[in-house]
Amino acid sequence: NVGKSSLINALVNHKNLAKTSGRPGKTQLINHFLINNEWYLVDLPGFGYAKVPKTIRAEFHDMISQYLLNRTNLMCLFVLIDVRHKPQSIDQEFMHWLAEKTIPFVMIFTKADKLGKVELAKNIGSYKVEMKKTWEELPEIFVTSAEKKTGTTEIVNLIESLNPQFKEII
């Protein structure tokens, strides 16, 4: 469980906007949240591990792929990664797919409060080393804790910087 819903709630300073669960795969639909009557934050089902049958996971994959490929006003996708884990091939493959399809994205490491500073730096470094094997330039990286609201200001600043661009394309 990477903590997507918890991060959404922390970003918009609303405890129960997105339903949270300790169970991976809780988000099974595309949920649109209109924020301040100005912009949408969209919560997609997780692309990776979920405690659901393989057929449902395949449906998630197709639904997410179609959404991302056909969403012309998508300004930036947030790829959330639980910083406690070593680089996962599914995350790497997904980010390569995004790059191939020219879908703009940033990496957001979640649950930073669960690690000490040394282990946190080591785990992020492992991702960077792995990605530099095939990437010329790494995507922008954010390090967050929804519980402590670490990194949320930086993400909100990114969203605000994208909003003028969003208004131009709608």
Where do the model's predicted regions map?
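Short, flexible loop segments at the rims of nucleotide/cofactor-binding pockets, characterized by
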Residues: 17-19, 53-57, 82-86
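Conserved nucleotide-binding/hydrolysis micro-motifs of P-loop NTPases
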Residues: 26, 39, 46-48, 84-86, ...
